[in-house]
């Protein structure tokens, strides 16, 4: 690597790299997935240049690995993301999210009358594929919402 081609975000020795996140989505992922609730170092790259996307976000979390469920839950926000498992500075595993059947403990129901706002329950949504959209159905109020409505909440 020449001095003209240096990394824009420092490499990590061990942990997870979430790459190819659509620009402006990185912070939302950190918040929704509670990725900052750790004492491990997190490196965030925002609006980085990308050949295929134009611009992208990137998240690196040291000494932390995402479960398969967590990776799949990224599909609503970053369907083209790549989740890399890093060990000793090398990529030892690579996966892409696929739409799960359910998303638990991440989203908030947009229905202000939903019991999930008043009771200490974990959110839970069924993921329903529609012709031109992805709908999310709340386990508690049983209302269906376009995924964009829930994501904006």
Curated annotation (Swiss-Prot):
GO-annotated biological processes: 'de novo' pyrimidine nucleobase biosynthetic process; pyrimidine nucleotide biosynthetic process
A GO term, aspect molecular function: metal ion binding
Swiss-Prot/TrEMBL keywords: Metal-binding, Pyrimidine biosynthesis, Zinc
Signal peptide span: none
Binding, Zn(2+): 109, 114, 138, 141
Source lineage: Bacteria, Pseudomonadati, Pseudomonadota, Gammaproteobacteria, Enterobacterales
Note on cofactor: Binds 1 zinc ion per subunit.
Pfam families: PyrI, PyrI_C
Protein name per Swiss-Prot or TrEMBL: Aspartate carbamoyltransferase regulatory chain
SUPFAM superfamilies (UniProt xref): Aspartate carbamoyltransferase, Regulatory-chain, C-terminal domain, Aspartate carbamoyltransferase, Regulatory-chain, N-terminal domain
Family label: Belongs to the PyrI family.
InterPro entries cross-referenced by the UniProt entry: Asp_carbamoyltransf_reg_N (IPR020545), Asp_carbamoylTrfase_reg (IPR002801), Asp_carbamoyltrfase_reg_C (IPR020542), Asp_carbatrfase_reg_C_sf (IPR036792), Asp_carbatrfase_reg_N_sf (IPR036793)
Cellular component terms (Gene Ontology): aspartate carbamoyltransferase complex
Cofactor: Zn(2+)
Assembly mode: Contains catalytic and regulatory chains.
HAMAP family with a match to the protein in the record: Asp_carb_tr_reg (MF_00002)
Top-level taxon of the source organism: Bacteria
Functional note: Involved in allosteric regulation of aspartate carbamoyltransferase.
